[in-house]
Amino acid sequence: MPGAAAAAAAAAAAMLPAQEAAKLYHTNYVRNSRAIGVLWAIFTICFAIVNVVCFIQPYWIGDGVDTPQAGYFGLFHYCIGNGFSRELTCRGSFTDFSTLPSGAFKAASFFIGLSMMLIIACIICFTLFFFCNTATVYKICAWMQLTSAACLVLGCMIFPDGWDSDEVKRMCGEKTDKYTLGACSVRWAYILAIIGILDALILSFLAFVLGNRQDSLMAEELKAENKVLLSQYSLE
């Protein structure tokens, strides 16, 4: 019996360094996951700002050197000159779709607006981290970000379908047609929206990875607790 007790004590002493190493690895793992999660949250907020800017700003397409009229178009707001002065006449409102020059512009406004609402809802869901399972919240946000990216893709693809409208042709020339800008050019808000698609896809992928890591982290914690209980039971 004394020999068995001594052997058990020696085995327990040998296990201590391994347990300490596992605990250190676990601590670093948790710290790194939290740091990545904070960065993910910050970039999600940045993406939301980009989305709002793309939705509001009327600089998706604009005039060029050879355009008949000066002006610029956004999703739902546009300004065109009259050819006699440098003043621009502005029209369009998101609350009044009848003022939009094309059905494609209406559809694009809807999808980009939906994308904006989804990413804002995703940020609101950050409060769920205080009440719900962390992995579940990450996965909810990931699906919302992925859907937001899909809406952005639809909006950016549908928007050029409205370039054949009379108002756009008045600014860009008669050579303007669907997906052909004529004498006009793509402006920064459209480019920013396309970059936002890539941003949203990366954020959603990262959220899925963080959610899965949280699941594996919980499984490792459960295994560690079971090992401690088994070692204590064997010592007894």
Curated annotation (Swiss-Prot):
Bilayer topology term: Multi-pass membrane protein
UniProt signal peptide: none
GO CC terms in record: plasma membrane
GO process annotations (BP): sensory perception of sound
Domain of life: Eukaryota
Sequence intervals crossing the membrane: 36-56, 110-130, 140-160, 191-211
Compartment(s) of residence: Membrane
InterPro entries: LHFPL
This protein's UniProt keywords: Membrane, Transmembrane, Transmembrane helix
Family, per entry: Belongs to the LHFP family.
Record protein name field: LHFPL tetraspan subfamily member 3 protein
